[in-house]
């Protein structure tokens, strides 16, 4: 021990402790300390041979049986359908940005597919419907196969040995979850490839840290930015990749800011703004471009219309809204439709119970609810007459936004009112009811409502524009003048049987809420002789691109945040690193075949072991150094904290934020973190198999080739064995007996046909 460890209190060699204060900086060099890049350790031909091997293996695992099954599998129902909508140019709405979906549609366009098949249900036949599904799946397979050699090149760029490069590549090449997701018409192959390209590009950029602003320096910095834009333009979990690179960039800039680097503030500013331009501005412009292309292609009315504002819908060809909207006039009898739930404002001659089950007291007034029903316009209980409140407003006078009106219920003759009485289901909201005759006159101010125009992105309290109101085409907030609440309904909880399980209507104090939007759907008393019945072709309107983008962006965020309900396939982040359970993607009841989405459990568990070992090494190093005992050499510590630290942060940034999210979470969300953990695992194996001693101990400096080959061979053999053992569940091409199915129900895996 005395020969290998530097003891407390003594430093007979006169060598200084390798503390931060003793680090020497080269003047005017942009040395980036986060990735302690070193040259490759072995001859180039060995890297080339190993790279060729893993590339061929990746192609084999991704392209084998690509046409099996020849039916719709899992989320192909969504992303195949979106490709068809692009090909037909019909507008649709989705939570994810357009980039990866545009790539899928581009494949269909290249081969001349018309998009007639709509991928309605899992199990629908591709063969019977003449769908070019193998071409679609080939896009994912190409991307999935490309991930593996890019990982290898990343490890090589970071200075790791051939064995370490091979091990990282094998973990992903033979991971069942990665293979499954890169063989189907899904977005994940694009996402993970973009993550891999980002880390590779940034690693390459770091190798040119001493050649600031050279062409290669700019090339790889911009390549990092473009890759980041591809990540964030595929799925919004790409923000975690931004977090990874952001932490590295902040660390790098912090080093450059040190006066010992010798940079002037002007030179530091050049570094700062170069990164701002390449990593934020350029990616954001590319991100916007995909939305521009999205809008340019989707010019026809489609299933996504209902999500968008009326103004947006009027920009689409063949929009029923543009064709059938009519100006609304006073004394028109209309139906009022809630935009979010599609329910109609309704009332009937039944009262709220005087006392609710929780003991609260109601007004015992006439119920006001919302209903979803066909031919809603034919029911007088869904019809409301718009009564003016200003002098001079007669029959035929147009209704404008910001007008103050009253609503008379056609079915019962009373007036809509809300007041300071708690609603049945939401005690913080106000109850809506209907009052009659003298009471309506006495409480006149409580029957007044302002029709406030909804403009996406604007503050509804400040929206003062007066605009002609049209059926279908004008989105409104209906604001109570007296108590300043917005009329609101919801369908997450329905009223009890005393209200026929209809939707509650209440006054919402949070006026800006996006759920407060209504429109006048249909004029029910429009006479055949009314000039408004004469069809006049309407010109398709235009909206500025940024206005359309902002509206869609806010809707995507809003609906993404609404994904908080339970899902049968949802899992918790704590289960992911150990692949405790998976998801049934497809099952064929006739041939008893199935596809089950699960990671390579051996590979996943090995990654967790290596991550845990790393944390243990860090703790041991910090504790021993507090006692002035230096076990690791300076070079080993640089490797431990810089290169491996960067990859560890990358894993944590792609994984830990999911614990803070309230939305639905699935195992496939872990795949980017799994990719980074695979890179990390190869690096840590090399670290463990190297001589990292701070003092000469007679052992060769560097990697122990025999040790690393033995470790990599043993771990890789186990990973590859598991991959082929679970292969029938990955490809869905082999029948398993019930006994064979049961034998594969590891951990919490639940498979079909085990009986």
UniProtKB/Swiss-Prot annotation:
One of its GO terms (molecular function) is identical protein binding. It comes from Candida albicans (strain SC5314 / ATCC MYA-2876). Pathway: Protein modification; protein glycosylation. Forms a functional homodimer. SMART domains: MIR. GO terms for biological process: cellular response to neutral pH; filamentous growth; filamentous growth of a population of unicellular organisms; filamentous growth of a population of unicellular organisms in response to neutral pH; fungal-type cell wall organization; negative regulation of proteolysis; protein O-linked mannosylation; regulation of endoplasmic reticulum unfolded protein response. This is Dolichyl-phosphate-mannose--protein mannosyltransferase 4. Protein mannosyltransferase (PMT) involved in hyphal growth and drug sensitivity. Transfers mannose from Dol-P-mannose to Ser or Thr residues on proteins. PMT1, PMT2 and PMT4 account for most of the protein-O-glycosylation activity, while PMT5 and PMT6 may specifically modulate a much narrower spectrum of target proteins. Accounts for the O-glycosylation of AXL2, responsible for bud site selection, as well as of the SEC20 t-SNARE component. O-glycosylation of SEC20 is essential for its stability. Required for biofilm formation.
